[in-house]
Regions:
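Terminal substrate-recognition subdomain of acyl/acetyltransferases
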Residues: 1, 161-180
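A short, well-structured alpha-helix characteristic of acyl/acetyltransferase catalytic modules
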Residues: 1-50, 176-180
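Acetyl-CoA-dependent GNAT
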Residues: 42-103, 173-177
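Glycine-rich acetyl-CoA-binding "A-motif" of GNAT/NAT acetyltransferases
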Residues: 76-79, 138, 164
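Conserved beta-strand-loop-alpha-helix junction that forms the acyl-donor binding cleft
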Residues: 99, 130-140
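Conserved acetyl-CoA-binding loop-helix of GNAT-fold acetyltransferases
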Residues: 105-119, 137, 141-145
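Conserved catalytic-core motifs of GNAT/GCN5-like acyltransferases
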Residues: 129-132, 149-166
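Conserved active-site tyrosine of GNAT-family acetyltransferases
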Residues: 143, 148, 170
Length: 180
């Protein structure tokens, strides 16, 4: 499966992506700490991750609804989009990681999330959530640009560098007047 939005392509995982994933999980981890700086990313066993990703690829059927797609820009694998249903929710939450630094701040995240939402809209979904924290200015700016609105704030949910930070839940609801 492949979806293109401007210079961004969302696509299924390929074997050539595995080494990037290993690097992002073990050495080039700054993307993780921008997203969840209060957590610690434990290094992964490369062989274990390789087997896990190969299993995911092997089990993927053409008609399966995707929960994860890789992001490619300028012909390069740079990150991923994913989705999940938060506990007790029937509304899909979206996630995005631009793991390659030089591709951040260029609108690629907004294009990737737009393409991902359009993919799910084909299945009748018109509401989406994003979960982030008050210090993630890049994600908050992207969310606002895409029309997400804050629906819940939990003050002091996280401690980052000794300071309290808020958990923020944002939602986008496509309206009757927006194109499908």
């Amino acid at each position: 499966m492949q979806i293109t939005q401007g210079e961004v392509t969302l696509r299924d995982t390929r074997a050539s992506d595995i080494e990037d994933e290993i690097r992002w999980m073990n050495t080039d981890t700054d993307w993780f700490y921008a997203d969840t700086p209060w957590e610690t990313l434990e290094p992964v066993d490369p062989e274990e991750l390789r087997r896990e990703m190969e299993g995911i690829m092997a089990g993927l059927k053409e008609d399966s609804v995707r929960w994860r797609l890789e992001i490619e820009a300028s012909g390069r694998h740079i990150g991923l989009v994913s989705s999940y249903f938060p506990e007790g929710s029937v509304v899909r939450a979206l996630g995005i990681e631009i793991c390659e630094k030089e591709f951040r701040g260029r609108g690629i995240g907004a294009a990737a999330l737009t393409a991902f939402m359009e993919y799910y809209r084909r299945f009748g979904e018109d509401r989406f959530l994003l979960e982030t924290w008050s210090g993630n200015e890049r994600m908050l700016g992207c969310a606002r640009k895409l029309g997400f609105a804050e629906v819940k704030r939990t003050e002091g949910a996280y401690t980052v560098d000794g300071k309290k930070a808020d958990a923020i839940l944002l939602e986008k609801v496509y309206g009757e007047t927006e194109g499908r």
